[in-house]
Amino acid sequence: MDVLNSIGFVNFWGVTPFINLFETEDELIKKTTINEPVNVLISNSNDLRHFIYTIYKLFVSQKEKGTEYRPINFYIHEDHLEVLCRDLLFLHLITDRNKSIIERCEMLMEIYGNCLLPSRTIDYINITYKLLISFICQDKKSQPVYKNIIDLSCLTHKQIDSMQEIFSSYDSKYPYDIEKYRNDRVRYCLKDRYDYRKNLFDWDYNMNIQNFAPIIRLRYYIFWRENGIAFVMRVNQYKFPNRTLACYIEGKKKQGHDSCMVRGYWGDIVNSPYLSYGLELETREEISYFYANNKIDYLRDSQDVTEYNLVKFLLRMDHDEKYDFMKREKEKERLRQERIKREEEEQEKKEKEEQEKKEKEEKEKKKKLKPIAEQEDEEEEEICTDSQETKERKEKEKKEKEEKEKEEKKKKEEKEKKENEKKDEGIIIGKNDNIKEMTKKLAKVVNESKSSDTTEESLIKAMDNEKTYDTNELIQAFREVKFKIFLVGGEIEKNIYKKKKFKNYFDVILYGFHARSKFNEMQKSILKPTTRLLFELNSYMASFEEKTRKEYRENLVKMCKNNGFVLDDTSLKYLYQFKIKQENQQENQQENEEENEINTTIESNVTESTNA
């Protein structure tokens, strides 16, 4: 199998789990006398998982420990603008408080990893893409909730126009046969082995994925490899194509070999979208919900883990509430048992009806076999018995009706007496009473009558007001954690490395797996002496063997050492962290001081010349 083709030319989801870019006790981000913003670059991570998790952790530490942090500037860079458009769509969905948290999470999972979508998500996309177009075009009428946290200044006019075209292509009126495009990709990768693809999918799982991610179940992985559907919610029918996964890449024509742009599905067909949110958990208690025997046996699958993580993040960031997983599971069990009971009762009713029908049919057959005289005698006897029973039943019904009418009359009389007493108490006015006193007494009577009738309604409204929240505001974490998102598209060398604005600018840089090739000597210009470098690894990618994974790690460490970086002890299995050597730090500081001195001398000379 061609590895590069199977990974995809345009990646729509991450290949590593989420991480916190700042530790909770990190001195870099703590608020001090220096309140300059911390600048973070996230390049080609393919989604917002690192951003969401860092904001979640900072918000939790602010609430629990009371720590204050410096403002943060997140520069989210993607080579392909289609991925940036998806990021904007996910931000809109996360901040959409008209939807419940569970609805938001389910729609996010479906748009994130499914090639086919249900009708409700398609309707939502058809509404939101118009709002996103108006936001990108800076229409004054469109004032979304997230307008103050997203900055488009790093995008060119040409990129904004192309993003507008991408959003307009989300409309369901434009055809996009994603099943055909994806099947062509699979057929091209497997070639002669396409007819035996299920066996190959099984091989990839057992030889690669099962070793590092056993919670990804075999049947779900094979179902995704074959159909492109990773997350199945309830009883939805997945029929409509996910147009957010459409993109263009450069290709060549068969005749003449002229270059052209080819539209299709150019994403991942091997690794699966379970890796980003469906593997890692924070605490041992959470691990006990999904695993047993120290992560050897699993109780649930990766879809449950992704749903748990997303609901936990959004519930805490929006409502500042902890997610009680076991309580929700008990409610699910209760609802499931009720549904089972209902189904059993319905089956019993159907069986009884069928038995009654059979008995009637048998009786009719027997009647036909009996002689006519006997049938007439039996019919007369049945009529007599029926007439007696009907008479007795009618008499009982009459007695019951009379009793009910008597009770209703008594109740009405009692109500009328009480109302008359209230009117007499409230409305009777003395000769010496003023008009103001009259109005006061009348108002008391009216208020008492209204309050007695609407006590339940007022309680319901009060409960609703406690549950509802302002839909025109950001979620709580986005309001309290000070940050801003800058979207950057296109080549990183042209849009970041070569710009003077970003010289010695970034404090933290995270490179996705596909951005490793963009790391070169030009990258040193944007670094500070204390910059931390983070690199995503291919530890959880099924398209690589164990040897190639080790070689990739070794080559990455060598490359960073040659450029003056040292591997940090806080590195993870799926992510390496590097720091600049102390010698290089001193050299960089000297260079910065010399540059500052030169700039000051130039400024002083300019001022002297202007004064002269």
Language model: regions and residue ranges:
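Intrinsically disordered, low-complexity proline-rich tandem-repeat tracts
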Residues: 593-594
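Domain-level detector for long C-terminal conserved domains
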Residues: 1-401, 412, 418-584, 597-612
